[in-house]
From Swiss-Prot:
Function: Ligand for members of the frizzled family of seven transmembrane receptors. Probable developmental protein. May be a signaling molecule which affects the development of discrete regions of tissues. Is likely to signal over only few cell diameters.
Entry protein name: Protein Wnt-3b
Organism: Alopias vulpinus
Processing after translation: Palmitoleoylation is required for efficient binding to frizzled receptors. Depalmitoleoylation leads to Wnt signaling pathway inhibition.
Gene Ontology CC terms, in alphabetical order: extracellular space
Main location per the UniProt record: secreted
Stored InterPro entries: Wnt, Wnt_C
């Protein structure tokens, strides 16, 4: 009579919100880099260097960039962006749908609407 014991281990994916928050933190603290070209024995070599020396240098786990994002506030046919002018925003939101962010500092107009709609309610 023998007994068997099985042990199974697996990795579980973290909650989607946790991953999103982590990536947003990385994005918000990304380091701007510059490309430097220098000559070595094997030819020209390009390396990345932090643009601002007064900040701590990025680690291997930090997010870095060397090109700025396009201006999404204004229309850009090249990127297919329509810009944010005349978009509906949420005055009370501090998120991506909020007027502060979506209106790009241009200000916004507040409009109050009163609607009458048939709701097909059953009481």
């Amino acid at each position: 009579s023998g007994s068997c014991e099985v042990k199974t281990c697996w990795w579980a994916q973290p909650d989607f919100r946790v991953i999103g928050d982590y990536l947003k933190d990385k994005y918000d603290s990304a380091s701007e880099m510059v490309v430097e070209k220098h000559r070595e024995s094997r030819g020209w070599v390009e390396t990345l260097r932090a643009k601002y020396e007064l900040f701590k240098p990025p680690t291997e786990r930090d997010l870095v960039y060397y090109e700025n994002s396009p201006n999404f506030c204004e229309p850009n046919a090249e990127t297919g962006s329509f810009g944010t002018r005349d978009r509906i925003c949420n005055v009370t939101s501090h998120g991506i749908d909020g007027c502060d962010l979506l209106c790009c500092g241009r200000g916004h107009n507040t409009r109050t609407e009163k609607r009458k709609e048939k709701c097909h309610c059953i009481f």
